[in-house]
């Protein structure tokens, strides 16, 4: 039996990086690759808050998923209530006032007070940064 010849790697120029193809409606569009739709989550923000409050504590993927669902649910409830309040007052724009009132209606007692004060502080900080 003859000895096997050594395989040499093909000298190939490095492939150029192409910008990611956007998701298209039809897959037969000239052979373009479809990118996976991005799923937007609050994971990075939840993680930052966790590290501010408990620096030595981690969070599992399952717990992060639950927290993300929780934030989405609360956001949806507040947005829905704020939308109703704007409609009651015959306004087409949701303002900070509608959001604040929605928070007071949805969240119970002390939690609402803390949420309103933190929200007011965040809006003040944002407004001062704009000037």
From Swiss-Prot:
<keyword id="KW-1017">Isopeptide bond</keyword>
<feature type="cross-link" description="Glycyl lysine isopeptide (Lys-Gly) (interchain with G-Cter in SUMO); alternate">
    <location>
        <position position="7"/>
    </location>
</feature>
<dbReference type="Pfam" id="PF00125">
    <property type="entry name" value="Histone"/>
</dbReference>
<protein>
    <recommendedName>
        <fullName>Histone H2B</fullName>
    </recommendedName>
</protein>
<dbReference type="GO" id="GO:0046982">
    <property type="term" value="F:protein heterodimerization activity"/>
</dbReference>
<dbReference type="InterPro" id="IPR009072">
    <property type="entry name" value="Histone-fold"/>
</dbReference>
<feature type="cross-link" description="Glycyl lysine isopeptide (Lys-Gly) (interchain with G-Cter in SUMO)">
    <location>
        <position position="18"/>
    </location>
</feature>
<feature type="compositionally biased region" description="Basic and acidic residues">
    <location>
        <begin position="1"/>
        <end position="19"/>
    </location>
</feature>
<feature type="modified residue" description="N6-acetyllysine; alternate">
    <location>
        <position position="7"/>
    </location>
</feature>
<dbReference type="GO" id="GO:0035861">
    <property type="term" value="C:site of double-strand break"/>
</dbReference>
<keyword id="KW-0007">Acetylation</keyword>
<feature type="modified residue" description="N6-acetyllysine; alternate">
    <location>
        <position position="8"/>
    </location>
</feature>
<feature type="modified residue" description="N6-acetyllysine">
    <location>
        <position position="12"/>
    </location>
</feature>
<comment type="similarity">
    <text>Belongs to the histone H2B family.</text>
</comment>
<dbReference type="GO" id="GO:0003677">
    <property type="term" value="F:DNA binding"/>
</dbReference>
<dbReference type="InterPro" id="IPR055333">
    <property type="entry name" value="HISTONE_H2B_site"/>
</dbReference>
<keyword id="KW-0539">Nucleus</keyword>
<comment type="function">
    <text>Core component of nucleosome. Nucleosomes wrap and compact DNA into chromatin, limiting DNA accessibility to the cellular machineries which require DNA as a template. Histones thereby play a central role in transcription regulation, DNA repair, DNA replication and chromosomal stability. DNA accessibility is regulated via a complex set of post-translational modifications of histones, also called histone code, and nucleosome remodeling.</text>
</comment>
<feature type="modified residue" description="N6-acetyllysine; alternate">
    <location>
        <position position="17"/>
    </location>
</feature>
<dbReference type="GO" id="GO:0005634">
    <property type="term" value="C:nucleus"/>
</dbReference>
<feature type="modified residue" description="Phosphoserine">
    <location>
        <position position="11"/>
    </location>
</feature>
<feature type="cross-link" description="Glycyl lysine isopeptide (Lys-Gly) (interchain with G-Cter in SUMO); alternate">
    <location>
        <position position="8"/>
    </location>
</feature>
<keyword id="KW-0832">Ubl conjugation</keyword>
<feature type="cross-link" description="Glycyl lysine isopeptide (Lys-Gly) (interchain with G-Cter in ubiquitin)">
    <location>
        <position position="125"/>
    </location>
</feature>
<keyword id="KW-0158">Chromosome</keyword>
<dbReference type="GO" id="GO:0030527">
    <property type="term" value="F:structural constituent of chromatin"/>
</dbReference>
<keyword id="KW-0544">Nucleosome core</keyword>
<dbReference type="InterPro" id="IPR000558">
    <property type="entry name" value="Histone_H2B"/>
</dbReference>
<keyword id="KW-0597">Phosphoprotein</keyword>
<comment type="subunit">
    <text>The nucleosome is a histone octamer containing two molecules each of H2A, H2B, H3 and H4 assembled in one H3-H4 heterotetramer and two H2A-H2B heterodimers. The octamer wraps approximately 147 bp of DNA.</text>
</comment>
<dbReference type="GO" id="GO:0000786">
    <property type="term" value="C:nucleosome"/>
</dbReference>
<feature type="cross-link" description="Glycyl lysine isopeptide (Lys-Gly) (interchain with G-Cter in SUMO); alternate">
    <location>
        <position position="17"/>
    </location>
</feature>
<dbReference type="InterPro" id="IPR007125">
    <property type="entry name" value="Histone_H2A/H2B/H3"/>
</dbReference>
<keyword id="KW-0238">DNA-binding</keyword>
<feature type="region of interest" description="Disordered">
    <location>
        <begin position="1"/>
        <end position="38"/>
    </location>
</feature>
């Amino acid at each position: 039996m003859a000895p096997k010849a050594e395989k040499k790697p093909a000298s190939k120029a490095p492939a150029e990086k192409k910008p990611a193809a956007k998701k298209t409606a039809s897959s037969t569009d000239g052979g373009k690759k479809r990118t996976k739709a991005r799923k937007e989550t609050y994971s990075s923000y939840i993680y930052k808050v966790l590290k501010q409050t408990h620096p030595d504590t981690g969070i599992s993927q399952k717990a992060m998923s639950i927290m993300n669902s929780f934030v989405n649910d609360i956001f949806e409830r507040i947005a829905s209530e704020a939308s109703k309040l704007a409609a009651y007052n015959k306004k087409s724009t949701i303002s900070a006032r509608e959001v604040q009132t929605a928070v007071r209606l949805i969240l119970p007692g002390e939690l609402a007070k803390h949420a309103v004060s933190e929200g007011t502080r965040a809006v003040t900080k944002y407004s001062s940064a704009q000037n």
